[in-house]
């Protein structure tokens, strides 16, 4: 937790409840944009709807075993490249090809689901990066859809080809290794490096110096793995001294776990959020980058792959 963050957050929590969440607090966010998160029960209303493409981001084998009727399959591997490190943002040209071949145009609403809490959000962030904002992720993913007794299909889908034009990558959603290093060397109090890996990973392999640790799992309810409510999210992050007016740079091991945190923070009103796409894998691979280890911990050893 950042210095004095707990006392500040506690005060703000009382203030929020005193005026009511959505009242006049300077830290209150009023949702004016469509939600990025779609309840599993709501998906049935979009199946077969014109202008909507439902995307299953699971593996081809999982898709073949049963998927939402009419859903196309875009596994995460189709929207990333492994250069210079694993799971980097793929090219403009590749995104245009993948989206177009799956019937997605610039006017299409995309609704994505996964089974790992990461794939759908990574697709959302990727589309944001290339200028497409009409995207939603299904809360709770495939497990939540299965619990709704939604009719599944094992038939593959052959969508009509569409034209998708990707814009130049949006720098406001992306952070580079150089920018992270600049923050380490000359910290800006308004900028926060947010490490969403587990504390176990920190103890085993270290972290980027000055970064705040907050496991991405804290954004989900432990039972059904759905996103926590916006109000709970605001309080959780304020308790760590992370406010909507801060500039936040997210990272994990390969930037997959950072994606659902991006979605949840955006949903809670945070707009100055970027993902360090090279993530800790790139950072720790560069011998010139400093690494912060907890006192008394063992030497770094490679661990998680996401």
Segments the model singles out, each with a brief description of its role:
Residues 20-23:
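C-terminal motif of bacterial Sec signal peptides marking the signal peptidase cleavage site
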Residues 1-10:
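Bacterial N-terminal signal peptides that target proteins for export
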Residues 59-62, 77-81, 115-119, 142-144, ...:
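Solvent-exposed loop/turn segments at secondary-structure junctions
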Residues 26-31, 84, 89-178, 257-273, ...:
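Thiolate-centered catalytic microenvironments shared by cysteine-dependent enzyme domains
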Residues 235, 240-296:
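C-terminal soluble interaction/assembly domains
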Residues 29-107, 181-245:
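Positively charged, proline/Ser/Thr-rich regional signature most characteristic
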Residues 80, 143-208, 288-306:
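Active-site neighborhoods of enzymes that stabilize oxyanions during catalysis
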């Amino acid at each position: 937790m950042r210095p004095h963050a707990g006392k500040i957050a506690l005060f703000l929590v009382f203030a929020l409840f005193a005026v009511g969440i959505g009242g006049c607090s300077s830290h209150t966010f009023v949702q004016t944009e469509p939600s990025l998160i779609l309840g599993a029960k709501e998906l049935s209303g979009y199946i077969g709807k014109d202008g909507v493409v439902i995307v299953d981001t699971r593996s081809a084998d999982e898709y073949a075993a049963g998927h939402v009727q009419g859903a196309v399959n875009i596994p995460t591997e189709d929207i990333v490249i492994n250069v210079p490190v694993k799971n980097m943002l793929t090219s403009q040209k590749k995104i245009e090809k993948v989206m177009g071949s799956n019937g997605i145009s610039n006017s299409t609403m995309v609704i994505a689901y996964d089974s790992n809490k990461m794939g759908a959000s990574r697709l959302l962030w990727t589309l944001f990066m290339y200028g497409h904002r009409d995207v939603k992720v299904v809360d709770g993913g495939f497990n939540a859809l299965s619990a709704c007794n939604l009719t599944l299909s094992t038939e593959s889908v052959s969508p009509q080809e569409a034209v998708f034009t990707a814009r130049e990558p949006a720098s406001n959603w992306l952070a580079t290794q150089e920018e992270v290093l600049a923050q380490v060397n000359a910290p800006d109090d308004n900028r926060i490096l947010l490490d969403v890996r587990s504390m176990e990973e920190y103890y085993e392999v270290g972290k980027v110096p000055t970064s705040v640790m907050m496991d991405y799992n804290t954004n989900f309810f432990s039972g059904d793995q759905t996103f926590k409510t916006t109000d709970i999210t605001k309080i959780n992050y304020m308790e760590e001294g992370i406010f909507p007016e801060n500039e936040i740079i997210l990272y994990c091991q390969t930037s997959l776990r950072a994606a659902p945190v991006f979605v949840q923070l955006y949903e809670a009103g945070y707009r100055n959020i970027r993902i360090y796409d090279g993530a800790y894998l790139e950072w720790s691979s560069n011998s010139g980058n400093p690494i912060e280890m907890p006192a008394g911990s063992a030497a770094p050893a490679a661990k998680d792959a996401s």
